[in-house]
Amino acid sequence: MADLVFFYGTLMTGFDRRRRVGIDTKLRYQGRGWINAALFDLGLYPAAVPASDGRVWGEVFELLEPSTVLPALDEVEGYRPTETDASLYVRAQVPVHLPDGTTAAAWVYFYNAPLGRAPQIASGDYLEYLKVH
């Protein structure tokens, strides 16, 4: 089975961040999907936190080189596997719901710091949210 990653923020298509991180050619787009989570606006980027009753929409990519892409993503997201308490985001494997009704396990980065007064993005769709804000 393929290694998958789910992006819900500035690593999605339409942003330049994947190219700047140097992973754009090491991913293969698989389509849109959603995870059970809640989405918040932190200003420059969004934050997802697990929520069984919420939906966060994003994009699913196959990792063509997991051994290089995951460490690069860990660094960008501030995830320290040996120091999760000190990590800005933590990486977890969760079910992602695909358009054909199936689910697949994908890596996702959940926010791991206080949300403060960050407003919730009710639609769970960061791209849609940016169009109206």
List where the protein language model places each region.
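Glycine-aromatic micro-motifs
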Residues: M1-H133
